[in-house]
């Protein structure tokens, strides 16, 4: 455990609570001290949900520490069962309350005797797993619980559906554009003539889980969430799963062709090639845009990418393969699955970076000085500090990246949204230059703001005047190179002569 003021993936209990609050009529009891109970505020503030967050904190206070937690936790579970009538109550500790080493399995068994609904302990090691791993394991645990329960009662659905059908696994509350992706995936499946059997966990009932065995295949659009569940369903029912993320023109087509292969192997006779061609040429604007003069202006520009495995890998491929942009490095904070990420992106970028340290990522960005950054909320902050534009492509994110308008990243409409995001993230040089020539609302001070708040060098009046003559879209880079040149040679202030010398020395 380490103290950090920024984490890319939160602690394990956040993952468990995301899964529990994604299902309909499921309540979570969090056994935790005050301070660990920020999930309710975070969810209601960020994801703009209409419903109250179904999470209750069973507070660990001094009375609990003196007498033990069992009585309080059991009372809270039974009370919520009577008040809310949930189908399932999930009990989760946090990494703080796990220190108490209490027998929470026993608490659940005691509560189950009095509760009318089901009660379950989210069995996750809070010191070994992060938010994403815990979410994946909790979803798998809930699915297994209800399938085994249905099997014991003889309620498990037999056989497959008459027409091709799919379980879409992994869309959750607080996910990056998950609601929009979910709508786009349902639309895509309808276009392909495939019925959505279940969509879990977002908006699903735990009572729907017993019919998951009827699907022809499982689709896992997000690498981080749903793979464990899909593997369990394959093991139990022989249901094949597809884990190709349909993001970008090429990967969406590859996903559709894999679906065709999987359902044809089970007796269907479909050919989706005409559909792929129609969508690629006429519905998605991305393929046309990639051949336009606008996109050619981006060819060879430098970019860096950082995020979770799913989004960082997909955006890296789109930038390099579909838009001709030079990805200097691509990175992920999913250290536990680094091998997969390397395999996916190594041929599309110069360097692969695996790190959970935002400081290291910020330094790597400053080192290569890209034309644009594609990352999380933290990379947006880094970009503002360095005066480099940033497109947000992965969680963790702030409220502006939970858009009310329709902005999927998946499917063919997703390709349009991603293309817009990428193109608009690059600073258009003439725009900056014209503002300088003709003025506007921007003041000279705003346009020439420093790239670093803690610069130890002074610019003289003639040095600053000379710097201001340089077009805005390259001024930041010239300033950084000049300051580096001055530090290396021990100058305390930068005048016009130093600027000229730096330009000659480093080609700034």
Curated annotation (Swiss-Prot):
Domain of life: Bacteria
GO terms (BP aspect): light-independent chlorophyll biosynthetic process; photosynthesis, dark reaction
Binding locations of substrate: 429-430
One Pfam short name: PCP_red
Co-factor requirement: [4Fe-4S] cluster
Keyword ATP-binding recorded: yes
List of residues binding [4Fe-4S] cluster: 36
EC number(s) recorded for this UniProt protein: 1.3.7.7
Keywords: 4Fe-4S, ATP-binding, Chlorophyll biosynthesis, Iron, Iron-sulfur, Metal-binding, Nucleotide-binding, Oxidoreductase, Photosynthesis
GO MF annotation: an example: oxidoreductase activity, acting on the CH-CH group of donors, iron-sulfur protein as acceptor
Pathway annotation: Porphyrin-containing compound metabolism; chlorophyll biosynthesis (light-independent)
Keyword NAD assigned: no
Catalysed reactions listed for this entry: chlorophyllide a + oxidized 2[4Fe-4S]-[ferredoxin] + 2 ADP + 2 phosphate = protochlorophyllide a + reduced 2[4Fe-4S]-[ferredoxin] + 2 ATP + 2 H2O
Protein family according to the UniProt entry: Belongs to the ChlB/BchB/BchZ family.
Stored HAMAP family: ChlB_BchB
Subunit description: Protochlorophyllide reductase is composed of three subunits; ChlL, ChlN and ChlB. Forms a heterotetramer of two ChlB and two ChlN subunits.
Purpose of the protein: Component of the dark-operative protochlorophyllide reductase (DPOR) that uses Mg-ATP and reduced ferredoxin to reduce ring D of protochlorophyllide (Pchlide) to form chlorophyllide a (Chlide). This reaction is light-independent. The NB-protein (ChlN-ChlB) is the catalytic component of the complex.
Protein's UniProt name: Light-independent protochlorophyllide reductase subunit B
Source organism of this protein record: Nostoc punctiforme (strain ATCC 29133 / PCC 73102)
Gene: chlB
């Amino acid at each position: 455990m380490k103290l950090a003021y920024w984490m890319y993936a939160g602690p394990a209990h956040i993952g468990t609570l995301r899964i529990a609050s994604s299902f309909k009529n499921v309540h979570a009891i969090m056994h935790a001290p005050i301070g660990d109970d920020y999930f309710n505020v975070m969810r209601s503030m960020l994801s703009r949900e209409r419903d109250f967050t179904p999470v209750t904190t069973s507070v660990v206070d001094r009375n609990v520490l003196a007498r033990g937690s069992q009585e309080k936790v059991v009372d809270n579970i039974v009370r919520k069962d009577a008040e809310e009538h949930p189908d399932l109550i999930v009990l989760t500790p946090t990494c703080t309350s796990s220190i108490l080493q209490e027998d929470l399995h026993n608490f659940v068994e005691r509560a189950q005797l009095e509760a009318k609904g089901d009660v379950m302990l989210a069995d996750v090691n809070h010191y070994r797993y992060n938010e994403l791993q815990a979410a994946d394991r909790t979803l798998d645990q809930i699915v297994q619980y209800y399938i085994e329960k249905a099997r014991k009662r003889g309620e498990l659905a037999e056989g497959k559906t008459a027409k091709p059908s799919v379980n879409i696994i992994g869309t959750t509350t607080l996910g990056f554009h998950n609601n929009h992706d979910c709508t786009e995936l349902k639309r895509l499946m309808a276009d392909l003539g495939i019925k959505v059997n279940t969509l879990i966990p977002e908006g699903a009932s735990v009572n729907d889980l017993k019919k998951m065995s009827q699907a022809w295949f499982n689709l896992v659009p997000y690498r981080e969430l749903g793979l464990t569940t899909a593997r369990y369903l394959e093991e139990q029912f022989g249901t094949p799963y597809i884990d190709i993320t349909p993001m970008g023109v090429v990967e969406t087509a590859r996903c559709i062709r894999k679906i065709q292969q999987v359902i044809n192997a089970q007796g269907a006779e479909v050919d989706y090639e005409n559909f792929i061609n129609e969508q690629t040429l006429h519905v998605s604007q991305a393929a046309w845009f990639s051949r336009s003069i606008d996109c050619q202006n981006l060819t060879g520009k430098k970019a860096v990418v950082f995020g979770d495995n799913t989004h960082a890998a997909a955006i890296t491929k789109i930038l390099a393969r579909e838009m001709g942009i030079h990805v200097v490095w691509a990175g992920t904070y999913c250290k536990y699955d680094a091998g997969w990420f390397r395999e996916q992106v190594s041929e599309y970028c110069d360097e692969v970076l695996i790190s959970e340290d935002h400081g290291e990522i910020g330094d790597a960005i400053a080192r290569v000085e890209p034309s644009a950054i594609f990352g999380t909320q933290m990379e947006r902050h880094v970009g503002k500090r360095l005066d480099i534009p940033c497109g947000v492509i992965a969680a963790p994110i702030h409220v502006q990246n939970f858009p009310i308008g329709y902005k999927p990243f998946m499917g063919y409409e997703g390709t349009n949204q991603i293309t817009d995001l990428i193109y608009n993230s690059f600073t258009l040089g003439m725009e900056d230059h014209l503002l300088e020539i003709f003025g506007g609302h921007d003041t000279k001070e705003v346009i020439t703001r420093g790239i670093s708040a803690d610069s130890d060098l002074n610019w003289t009046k003639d040095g600053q005047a000379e710097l201001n003559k340089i077009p805005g879209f390259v001024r930041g880079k010239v300033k950084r190179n000049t300051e580096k040149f001055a530090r290396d040679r021990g100058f305390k202030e930068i005048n016009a002569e130093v600027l000229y010398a730096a330009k000659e020395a480093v080609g700034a």
